[in-house]
Amino acid sequence: MNYFCERYPKREGLVTYIISGDDHEGWYGQREGVDIGWLMEQTARDKYKRTDLVNLGYMEAFIRLMHADYPDVHTYLLAAHPGGGSAYAISYAPQKYVEALQGGEKPAVILFGHWHKMFDLVIRNVICLGGGCTKDLDTFGRKNKLSYHVGGMIVELWQDSIGAIPRWRGEKKQYFDRGYYNDQWNYTG
């Protein structure tokens, strides 16, 4: 926690919302009963006086999107760190995820983490966004023939008078670095 809180960038006016997953940090929760997201936020607040790191919860968080002009009108964005491996096609895992949602719980938008993919798709009238990642390809990814999409996305959503999101725009920023080659023991790059 200390390493993260000391090194994670802090920018005036920006807040990072955290979803902890069912893998990596989630293993601590399963074995030791530690809620890593909560612990990270508390360490940031108590020890480092940081209020820019906010824990949304474990694996999923429904975020209410309020209409600016109609206070009683809203819809939901689901921030999800779903787990599971990358599929043969980028669209497959989000498709199966949306198909598994029960009636009445489909959000307007799902922002997916975990798969290290950047995408925008519409599946069953749900806008599905893969936010990319900040981790360059490593030996695990190369060995398993995975593709990591290093980068991120700025998304604008337009909400109509009944709360639906009929229009959106995503600006993707992709980075190409040589970390796989340069951060390994074999300097072939």
Residue ranges: model-predicted function:
Residues 57-59, 149:
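Residues that act as N-cap/strand-start positions at coil-to-secondary-structure junctions
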Residues 1-55:
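Core catalytic region of metal-dependent phosphoesterases/phosphodiesterases
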Residues 159-189:
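A short C-terminal boundary segment appended to hydrolase-like catalytic domains
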